[in-house]
């Protein structure tokens, strides 16, 4: 009797799991050769957390600013995402995707401890927290040291209505919260021997900097992923500067990645 009862419970639960959206490495890693257009739209609030949410973005206006995002391959284990004159370097290891550096005409950054972007699989309620440590230079005149903490959470799921009125179901929202401490110094102030010191990630030191420093930056990025698409269909980014404990909003911006421009419906992917 217990076995029959267990089978009934499992049978009733299966439709819930089948309907749940989930991100995985084979379907959601950036892929060489892909090209996307990010259409900037009226800034949108992300809305509530939880299940069965409805995100109605049908009234937002597409603005003139559009950005092309392309993915190319470097070697056998690095993907480069290029957008807005910046190249971001990504590396997949095990079940995770990391950012290992980025560069543009003024700034070059490389991570001693890469920044975790995803730990797959990602499903409603999953959350992972990690630390990062990076260094580089600005205009080859100033040294930059970036240290911080990121938390990636699948905090909501539901249905999304696009600016063109199309409705997407089985949508999963991923929230990435980054806390960043930045220090800049003149290049001659850093001894050459520092670059040869073995790197050791100090989590306690990062926590101390974020809690005690008079100024630090926080960014929150919400991305909506729809079933059948490798890349997000909507994105909102909010940047806030904290000065002596007081928050100053830096900017909020939103983008839509129109599904009919992605051309990457997963059931027809060749890889």
Where are these regions (language model features)?
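Conserved functional acidic sites
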Residues: 21-271
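Bacterial Sec-dependent N-terminal signal peptides
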Residues: 1-24
């Amino acid at each position: 009797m217990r076995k029959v009862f267990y089978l009934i419970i499992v049978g009733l639960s299966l439709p819930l799991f089948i309907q749940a959206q989930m991100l995985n490495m084979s379907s959601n890693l950036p892929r060489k050769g892909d090209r996307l257009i990010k259409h900037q739209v009226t800034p949108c609030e992300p809305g509530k957390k939880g299940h069965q949410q409805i995100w109605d973005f049908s009234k937002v206006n597409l603005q003139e600013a559009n950005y092309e995002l392309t993915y190319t391959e470097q070697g056998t284990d690095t993907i480069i995402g290029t957008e807005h004159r910046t190249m971001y370097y990504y590396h997949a290891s095990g079940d995770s995707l990391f950012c290992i550096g980025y560069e543009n005409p003024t700034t070059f950054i490389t991570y001693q401890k890469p920044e975790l972007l995803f730990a797959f699989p990602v499903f409603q309620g999953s959350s992972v927290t990690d630390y990062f440590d990076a260094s580089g230079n600005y205009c080859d005149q100033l040294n930059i040291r970036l240290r911080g903490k990121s938390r990636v959470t699948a905090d909501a799921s539901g249905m999304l209505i696009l600016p063109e009125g199309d409705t997407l179901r089985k949508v999963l929202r991923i929230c990435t919260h980054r806390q960043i401490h930045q220090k800049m110094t003149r290049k001659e102030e850093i001894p050459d021997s520092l670059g040869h010191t073995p790197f050791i990630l100090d989590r306690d030191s990062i926590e101390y900097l974020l809690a005690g420093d008079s100024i630090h930056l926080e960014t929150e990025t919400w991305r909506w992923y729809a079933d059948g698409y490798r890349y997000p269909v909507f994105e909102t980014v909010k940047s806030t500067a904290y000065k002596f404990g007081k928050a100053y909003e830096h900017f909020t911006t939103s983008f839509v990645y129109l599904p009919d421009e992605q051309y990457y419906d997963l059931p027809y992917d060749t890889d």
